[in-house]
Amino acid sequence: MAPQNMPAVSIDINMFWQIINFLILMFFFKKYFQKPISKVLDARKEKIANELKQAEIDREMAAKANEETQGILKAARTEANEILLRAEKKADDRKEAILKEANSQREKTIKSAELEVEKMKKQARKELQSEVTALAVNLAEKMINEKLDSKLGANLLNVLLKR
C-alpha cells in the first residue's frame, strides 16, 4: 500500500464543535445550576452533620439516663434492704417483748400458784390443828370419863395420831 499523506495536525471540525458545546454547557451549568446544587448539597451535608450531633447527644443522654436509672435502682435496692432489716429487727423486738411478757405471766402464775399452795397448807394446818385439838380434847374426855390407865391412854393417842 501506498503511504497516505496525512496532515501533521489535523483537527476534526466535529470535535471542535463538541468542545465548544461542552464549554457552553459548563458555562450555563456554572451560572444557573452550580449555586442551587451546592446549596442542596451543603444543606444535605449540614443536615447529616446535625443528625450525627443529635445522635451523639441522644447517645450521651441515654448513657446518662442509664446511669441515673442504675443509681435509682441501687438506691431502691438499698432502701428495700434497709426496710427488710428494720422489719426483721421490729419482728425480733416484738418476739422478745412477747417472750418477756409470756415469761412474766408465767412467773406471776407460778407465784400465784405458790401463794395458793402456801395458803392451802396454812389452811390445812389450821384445820389439822383444830381437828387434833378436838381429838385431843375428845381423848382427854374419854380418858377422864373412863378412868383408863396410862397404857390405854397412850394406845388411844397413837391411834388418834395415826388417823
Curated annotation (Swiss-Prot):
Keywords: ATP synthesis, Cell inner membrane, Cell membrane, CF(0), Hydrogen ion transport, Ion transport, Membrane, Sodium, Sodium transport, Transmembrane, Transmembrane helix, Transport. Gene3D superfamilies: 6.10.250.1580. It comes from the Bacteria. The chain crosses the membrane at residues 9-29. GO terms for biological process: sodium ion transport. GO terms for cellular component: plasma membrane; proton-transporting ATP synthase complex. It is a single-pass membrane protein. CDD domains: ATP-synt_Fo_b (cd06503). GO terms for molecular function: proton-transporting ATP synthase activity, rotational mechanism; proton-transporting ATPase activity, rotational mechanism. It is found in: Cell inner membrane. F-type ATPases have 2 components, F(1) - the catalytic core - and F(0) - the membrane proton channel. F(1) has five subunits: alpha(3), beta(3), gamma(1), delta(1), epsilon(1). F(0) has three main subunits: a(1), b(2) and c(10-14). The alpha and beta chains form an alternating ring which encloses part of the gamma chain. F(1) is attached to F(0) by a central stalk formed by the gamma and epsilon chains, while a peripheral stalk is formed by the delta and b chains. The ATPase of I.tartaricus is of special interest because it uses sodium ions instead of protons as the physiological coupling ion. F(1)F(0) ATP synthase produces ATP from ADP in the presence of a proton or sodium gradient. F-type ATPases consist of two structural domains, F(1) containing the extramembraneous catalytic core and F(0) containing the membrane proton channel, linked together by a central stalk and a peripheral stalk. During catalysis, ATP synthesis in the catalytic domain of F(1) is coupled via a rotary mechanism of the central stalk subunits to proton translocation. Belongs to the ATPase B chain family. This is ATP synthase subunit b, sodium ion specific. It comes from Ilyobacter tartaricus. The gene is atpF.
